[in-house]
Amino acid sequence: KSAFSSLLILFAIATHENTRGVVTANTDTQLKSKTWAELNKWYNLFIGKELFTYTATSLFSADKQYEKTWRIDAIPWSESNPEAFAGLHNQGNRILIIFDEASAISDKIWEVTEGALTDKETEIIWCVFGNPTRNSGRFRECFRKHRNYWTTYQIDSRTVKISNKA
């Protein structure tokens, strides 16, 4: 999942000028040590890496003129500070949102994120990854009540040839 998320981030930022995005995970530790750390690995292999700057919390345009408008940020979510997800507007461009281990991300964060996705003529790529660890919440509803709004894939690691079954 982390490798796919990383490649998606690199694809999104490299194929559309002024892409903006937010990546979060179930915990700050997951975000920093797994999701964003995996991005570092793939960024270092990325043929266009000189066009972007990677930091511990951001991936952004190396061109100073675009560093504020062409970027993807790793932002830990907090139920006490949902506003961190409220200002994600990018009229006429692209927005990327990734929720890693999404079943543990508060419904409040999902709602605030949905409210921020109102710009017309904007390409919105919202991907959520996770395991069904809870029997309620917005992630679960991606496969139930809200399944018509999402394209879903369920992958059983027991049937994947390259997974570690130890």
Spans of features found by a protein language model:
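Phosphate/NTP-binding elements of NTP-utilizing enzymes
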Residues: 1-166
